[in-house]
Amino acid sequence: MKKTLMAVGLAAVMSIPFAANAADYVIDTKGAHASINFKVNHLGYSYIKGRFNKFDGEFSYDPANIAASSVVVNVDTRSLDSNHAERDKHIRSADFIDASKYSTATFKSTEVVDKGNGQLEVKGDLTLHGQTKPIVINAEFIGAGQDPWGGQRSGFAGTTRLELKDFGIQVMGASSYVDMELHVEGVQK
């Protein structure tokens, strides 16, 4: 009887770290602790940088089982901001991303691969400009822990390159692709 109780107790204690590791997070856009940034070649002479000001999403992260992790992000394409109102109006127009017709871009992961040393490969489907294509985000786990307000946070950074023609977006000059830089901090639900 004593051995049985010890075995049950040991099993319960050993399961605690695994249960505590799996967590669901809301991306902290309200606290401005997340950003979706872009960089695009401008006529072969320089780069234009910008961001999307409105987006939301969630992710699930389990450091003990990276493959069980997932992410979903929704981006309001009308919130594109390159710090130049006339250019933003043109990029949002039907000439390019047609934000009035395709006001939301969505990324849903299909697989998260642990590459070791905090490096991750996040594979998923991006719906942009009415077309859904598979993409890969090269990501890095930045850190996790308790914030000053008693909540739990987890943070990541990632990059990917999008070929505009893959999403039916007009290519102009040297701007055949856009580089994306992502910074995500989540607050545990």
From Swiss-Prot:
Statement: the UniProt record of this protein carries the keyword Nucleus: no
InterPro entries xref list: Lipid/polyisoprenoid-bd_YceI, TTHA0802/YceI-like_sf, UPF0312/YceI
Presence of the UniProt keyword Signal in the record: yes
Pfam families linked to this entry: YceI (PF04264)
A GO CC term assigned to this protein in UniProt: periplasmic space
Subcellular location: Periplasm
Superkingdom of the organism of origin: Bacteria
Alphabetized UniProt keyword annotations: Periplasm, Signal
Matching SUPFAM superfamilies: YceI-like
Signal peptide: 1-22
Family the entry assigns: Belongs to the UPF0312 family. Type 1 subfamily.
Database matches in NCBIfam families: PRK03757.1
Name listed for the protein in its UniProt record: UPF0312 protein VC_A0539
Source organism of this protein record: Vibrio cholerae serotype O1 (strain ATCC 39315 / El Tor Inaba N16961)
